[in-house]
């Protein structure tokens, strides 16, 4: 039996998440996995990512670093309680040595509001012994937060002009 390539392993994991396959974490991750969603709450010691803002974390409390399989399982369960992936586009996985990256988009419905959002993503992977050891997920958090926004408008000042994003 041939072993999976890194690209195949990553594609299989992402497919399992869409199916809400609860056994995926045990099959695809190293026991000491570092699973980062959009950044950490504190500065990255390696300087690769800035910390996420307190406002962003308040809006989307599942962001941050989840260490170990149990923490990843809790994150995924929390995510699945709050949103339903309703569609996804083509995915590209690039792999070299023990590192890989995946790029694509998905559409989800926020279960609390019924709103949908389409979100592009990029994921950086590090693999060890055929398992995912580091997973760094980046997405458009503004679109995600907007789908969960239950009321109120956003007032923005860009390019010297004020803009209002109404509640939908």
Where are these regions (language model features)?
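C-terminal and inter-domain tail/linker signature
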Residues: 1-168
């Amino acid at each position: 039996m041939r072993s999976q390539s890194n690209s195949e392993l990553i594609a299989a994991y992402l497919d399992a998440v869409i199916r809400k396959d609860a056994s995926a974490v045990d099959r695809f991750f190293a026991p000491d996995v570092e699973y980062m969603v959009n950044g950490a709450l504190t500065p990255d010691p390696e300087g690769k990512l800035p910390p996420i803002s307190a406002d962003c974390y308040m809006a989307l409390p599942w962001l941050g670093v989840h260490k170990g399989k149990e923490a990843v399982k809790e994150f995924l369960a929390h995510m699945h309680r709050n949103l339903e992936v309703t569609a996804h586009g083509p995915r590209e996985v690039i792999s070299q040595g023990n590192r890989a990256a995946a790029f694509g988009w998905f559409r989800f419905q926020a279960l609390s509001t019924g709103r949908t959002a389409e979100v592009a993503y990029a994921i950086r992977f590090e693999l060890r012994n055929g398992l995912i050891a580091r997973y760094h997920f980046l997405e458009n958090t503004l679109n995600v937060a907007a789908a969960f926004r239950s009321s109120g408008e956003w007032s923005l000042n860009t390019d010297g002009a004020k803009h209002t994003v109404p509640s939908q």
